[in-house]
């Protein structure tokens, strides 16, 4: 483990590393067997819905070729603000005047752009979401997956990401008075060599998240020194400082979450297993969950250490994305999401084909993990559709022919209330928005979905367009978090080509009697 210590502390750092290497952590052995996966039960759709015509989660090749018109089941479109499109992340805040605002990233400059930066969208009227302005400070030009709101301190922040090609800056905005007009508090590079912004170190943005109290922002750097996690002290929001950085014990960093008390971190190991080794029990998995003791950072001890205290890794997924600590029926669980299927990579055609040949699920999925004992997390459930079963391979592989990456599967998920989670909502590549009943985590069931129509013109703020994956009339990448509202039975999210979408549940499927959506408790 790499520690953010002066050179005189290097020996102590090596001692910590040797102690950690002696610990034994868990491997999800069930994931190493073949043909294990079962899909969740399908949603029962209403008479006026347009349900999927093939497998659950599938957009068949012939529909793509003809121009995909969308599917819906118990969810219907209420409003849309396409703008220039969107990219990877979205966030929400409701201010003291009860105005609801959406924030979402857009890609770096592409042809026909009108405005760069994070879009500020008024979604108070769900039928008429309106893009008001854009945030264009250095980290907001392309925050990638780091754009996050902290509700207790009423702050919006992002790091300079640009898909890991950014820099050490963090931008922090005050959104307390009027969420429609964020006020810049700081835009600073942390870790400067002169020590003026915390310990001297090189970091580059990509992913990130707040500690619940808003006093620390944690980031995942994919690039520097083979990848490192880092912690920024945001106690003084006008003068953020780098507190610590460390290298994960396996794979590279990505997303993360922190327990309510700030003491425990549920960080991801973004790894994968070569196709040839998927069924080889002698090859250990490198993708999954790393549990850290964050107490020394939370308590602001000098030269904080970040020991790893737990682990759960698997082979039936790769490129671990993020986690959400929740309680279901009073018991602690972790929602965990991958963005790649079995193998290595981002669900390319070759990866999916190889996974199918190994009788492993080809696409990424969400998982529910029991964290009653954070030192020994255990898998409870896999949450996925029929497209991700081995027997479906021959039917879905033709759908993705000619695509480069992110062909099917999860990216981000949210719950209704982390303190009493009843509902899981996930944005997926090509399969749209999927919503699940998780009140019984052993028997998850799908209750609704909405897969938007393919766009026929390019959205210049979409990374789906920027990286060449967009095809006119093809299905969208719904890659950002989903934001539920139990007070009126709606949700909003962004899909990269379609932009901001506001949706309403129909046929009385949601909210459940015990569902609630308090601010700041969804992801």
Label each residue range with its predicted role.
Residues 1-9:
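N-terminal secretory signal peptides that target proteins for export/translocation
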Residues 10-13, 89:
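Residue-level detector of intrinsically disordered/flexible regions characterized by low predicted structural confidence
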Residues 32-523:
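Feature marking well-ordered beta-strand scaffolds used for ligand recognition
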Residues 26-31:
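Boundary at the C-terminal end of the N-terminal hydrophobic targeting segment
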Residues 13-24:
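Bacterial N-terminal signal peptides
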Residues 2-3, 25, 122:
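Short intrinsically disordered, low-complexity coil segments enriched in acidic
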């Amino acid at each position: 483990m790499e520690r953010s210590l002066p050179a005189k502390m290097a020996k102590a750092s090596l001692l910590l590393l040797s102690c950690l290497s002696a610990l034994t952590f868990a491997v999800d052995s069930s994931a190493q067997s073949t043909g294990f996966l079962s899909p969740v039960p399908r949603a029962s759709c209403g008479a006026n819905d347009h349900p999927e015509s093939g497998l659950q989660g599938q957009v068949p090749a012939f529909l793509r070729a003809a121009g995909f018109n969308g599917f819906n089941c118990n969810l219907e479109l209420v409003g849309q603000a396409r703008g220039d499109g969107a990219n990877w992340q979205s966030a929400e805040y409701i201010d003291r005047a009860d105005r609801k605002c959406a924030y979402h990233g857009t890609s770096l400059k592409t042809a026909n752009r009108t405005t760069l930066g994070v879009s500020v969208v008024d979604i108070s009227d769900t039928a008429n979401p309106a893009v008001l302005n854009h945030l264009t400070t250095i980290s907001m030009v392309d925050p990638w997956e780091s754009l996050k709101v902290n509700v207790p301190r009423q702050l919006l922040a992002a790091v300079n990401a640009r898909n890991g090609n950014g820099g050490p800056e963090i931008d922090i905005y005050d959104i307390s008075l009027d969420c429609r007009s964020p006020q810049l508090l700081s835009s600073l590079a942390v870790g400067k060599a002169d020590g003026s912004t915390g310990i001297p170190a090189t970091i580059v943005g990509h992913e990130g998240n707040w500690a619940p109290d808003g006093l620390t922002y944690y980031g995942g750097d994919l690039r520097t020194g083979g990848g490192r996690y880092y912690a920024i002290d945001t106690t003084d929001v006008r003068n953020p400082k780098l507190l610590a950085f460390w290298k994960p014990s396996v794979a590279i960093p990505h997303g993360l979450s922190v327990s309510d008390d700030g003491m425990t971190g549920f960080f991801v190991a973004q790894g994968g297993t070569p196709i040839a080794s998927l069924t080889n029990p002698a090859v250990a998995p490198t993708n999954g969950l790393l549990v850290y003791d964050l107490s020394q950072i939370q308590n602001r001890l000098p030269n904080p250490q970040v020991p790893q205290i737990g682990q759960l890794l698997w082979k039936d997924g790769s490129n671990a994305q993020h986690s959400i600590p929740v309680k279901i029926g009073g018991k602690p669980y972790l929602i965990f999401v991958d963005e790649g299927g079995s193998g290595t990579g981002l669900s390319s055609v070759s990866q999916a084909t190889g996974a199918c040949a190994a009788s492993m699920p080809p696409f990424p999925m969400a998982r529910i993990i029991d964290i009653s004992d954070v030192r020994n997390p255990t898998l409870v459930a896999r949450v996925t559709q029929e497209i991700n079963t081995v027997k479906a391979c021959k039917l879905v592989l033709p759908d993705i022919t000619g695509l480069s990456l992110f062909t099917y599967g999860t990216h981000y998920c949210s719950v209704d209330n982390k303190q009493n989670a009843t509902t899981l909502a996930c944005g997926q590549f090509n399969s749209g928005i999927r919503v699940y009943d998780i009140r019984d985590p052993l028997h998850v069931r799908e209750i609704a979905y909405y897969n938007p129509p393919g766009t026929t013109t390019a959205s210049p703020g979409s990374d789906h367009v920027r990286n060449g994956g967009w095809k006119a009339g093809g299905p969208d990448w719904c890659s950002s978090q989903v934001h539920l509202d139990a007070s009126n039975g709606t949700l909003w999210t962004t899909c990269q080509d379609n932009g901001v979408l506001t949706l309403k549940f129909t046929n009385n499927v949601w909210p459940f009697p015990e569902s609630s959506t308090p601010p700041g408790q969804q992801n």
